Amino acid sequence: MNLNKNLPTGTRDKLFREAQAAYKIEQQVNHYFEKRGFKRIETPVIEFEDVFSSEHQADAKLYRFFDEKGRLTVLRPDMTLPIGRVVSTTGVTLPLKLSYSGKIFRANEDFGGEQNEQTQAGIELVGYPSIKAEIECILSGIGVLNALEIPNFQIELGHAAIYRRVIHLLNLPETAEIDFRLLIQNKSLTGIQQFVANNPSTLDDFILALPRLFGPAKAILKQAKNLTTDKGILTALSEMETIVEAVSYTADISVDLGLVQDFHYYTGIIFRGYADLAADNFLSGGRYDHLLEQFTSFSSPAVGLALNLDSLTTLQNRAGIIKKQAPTILLIHYDLDALPQAEKLMQETPNSELSFFDTSTNAISFAQKWHIPTVVHVSNQGIQTIFQKEADL
């Protein structure tokens, strides 16, 4: 079967206006991070599988292949772990404020509608234990969305320690923990009621309420504090309150106390970004204070933010924000010995381009086909207009 005209599942081409919009968004995001003092970092698209083994060892979403020495390598499925590898192996001095953008690859199931190749940009604050690091990530995310003019977006907060604390106190075996995780993620009221009946604990009231503990931040956090006396959960709720108070002036902030991230390295505040025109979140991140332990003997506090730039491009398109490229208004046909004059004219004339045809007849035909209103001929004798489209009445 010849596949030379096909694309792998979950990949797609971007043409013209969409490709230009995606390029500009990546530029805007990187420029915004640079203005906030972040230093850019780049890592290879190809990594050894061991970099992701702790997070993805039972995950079939990796693109795996062997290198020339028979070692198992992968296309990176996220950017955070490679940056953790860099920080832990290069001896760079902490703390650090890092930014990045690039491609990630995840082998999602066929027909799921997910893109296996995504463009991601983000930031990592490594070595900052203060809650100000979470606040900086959230403010940076909000700032990017405002700069991109994304309409009606909302930031949702959760806390990884809440779910971790519940699991710790329940002391569930691994299979039961997986089932419970799915119940929480799916907000299954009847399933959680049955679970509590089979696994009674001092957290019964809190667990039963978890599927409903999402919505306006201040009201939900106040309600949650009345449902438990556990110090670990109350500490997590207090951290969320602190962040809500700090950033609520910038955007609509909601909470979801049943928010469980797919990546298990999160240890504290987690957050996502949604918008009315988007089917899924396009912004995610949180605190992961033990990430470096996978690569070295020491740990370091860290907080990260990731943005799906492909989703943001789609959002801009749906919102009518993406502008058409300015049309070419002048085609410059030239003789080879007059190239310097033609180049100078193009540099001085906005929305102009050079003709690559040998004859003026072909240049004029091209202009008519692509609705370019004016064609000039540049020679050593000067500049002559050889085609002028009649003005529309």
Curated annotation (Swiss-Prot):
Q: Which domain of life is it from?
A: Bacteria
For this UniProt record, the keywords arranged alphabetically read as follows: Amino-acid biosynthesis, Cytoplasm, Histidine biosynthesis
Location in the cell reads: Cytoplasm
> What processes in GO biological process is this protein linked to?
histidyl-tRNA aminoacylation; L-histidine biosynthetic process
Name one matching Pfam family.
tRNA-synt_His
Q: Which SUPFAM superfamilies match?
A: Class II aaRS and biotin synthetases (SSF55681)
Pathway it works in: Amino-acid biosynthesis; L-histidine biosynthesis; L-histidine from 5-phospho-alpha-D-ribose 1-diphosphate: step 1/9
- Has the keyword Chaperone been applied to this entry? no
UniProt GO MF annotations: catalytic activity, acting on a protein; histidine-tRNA ligase activity; transferase activity
Q: Which InterPro entries match?
A: aa-tRNA-synth_II/BPL/LPL, HisRS-like_core, HisRS/HisZ, HisZ
Mind naming one GO cellular-component term on file for this protein?
cytoplasm
Q: How does it assemble?
A: Heteromultimer composed of HisG and HisZ subunits.
What family does the Swiss-Prot or TrEMBL record give for this protein?
Belongs to the class-II aminoacyl-tRNA synthetase family. HisZ subfamily.
Fill in the misc note: This function is generally fulfilled by the C-terminal part of HisG, which is missing in some bacteria such as this one.
Per its database record, what is this protein's job? Answer: Required for the first step of histidine biosynthesis. May allow the feedback regulation of ATP phosphoribosyltransferase activity by histidine.
Q: What is this protein called?
A: ATP phosphoribosyltransferase regulatory subunit
